[in-house]
Amino acid sequence: MTTSNSNGNRVALVVGSGSVKCAAALGLWRVLKREGIELDMVVGCSGGSLYTAAMALGFEQEESEQLTMKLWTRKVTDERNWRGLLSVFMPKALKFDSDFGLVKDRAVLASLTSFFGDRTFADTTTPLYIVATDLHNGEKVVLSSGRIVDAIRASIAVPWVWPAWQVNGRWLVDGCMSDPLPVDVAMKEGANIILAMGFESPGAGRVRSAIRYAFQLNSIQTNNLLRASFAFHNLAHHTEIIPILPDFKRAIGLYSTRHIPYVIEEGERAAEAQLPYIRQLLAAAA
């Protein structure tokens, strides 16, 4: 079996934003485990942070699938924050602030806590990096210490939808706002082979609610940043970046948990398509 540390290679997995589509990472993970390919680090952004965290902690795949079923349900966006909505029109009276969101975050936070508990980055067996965005200056923020729930909660804080999350005194929002596929984090940490799983979001034909409108704007920005990121990092000379881009023939929406088995299969298929090249790189001297 091939292992990632043979010949001095350092292999990283980066999983970008994509909500339910990020479950495709479980299919990729299945291929890596079957082939005996070890990861030296994992990097997650937005929805991708859920699965990279599960991998880094050594959770079983079945457990991670259950997380998907619990998290991406209508319940997490059903509890409207009416005070927050009114604060848009009466900002002074209702004290509009950085923690604004159209949806209360109690359900999503409860789901994350039930799965990850109080585990911290120190509990991981594989180095983990989670990317969020500073709300006030737009900087990309790489989290690698503290509670994992806090890091994920910050990384999935879709602007306008869920409130920003405070970590180490900084108000943080969705990592996709600064970099939807942060391969540069893995490069800076010394990876020379990077498996980059990214997702594009198709535009919605009709936008029927403020929540959908917020997600649509988020998708447009994410798609543009993703394309720009790939174009830029493909110019790297000392790092092999292997794009793993699942090709979904079905429409995968925010709440499409019934399609999770299909999403995982497509992730596995996309990984297998790149497997010969991955083996070739691992067999070569770093």
Regions found by a protein language model. Name each.
Residues 1-45, 53-286:
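Patatin-like phospholipase
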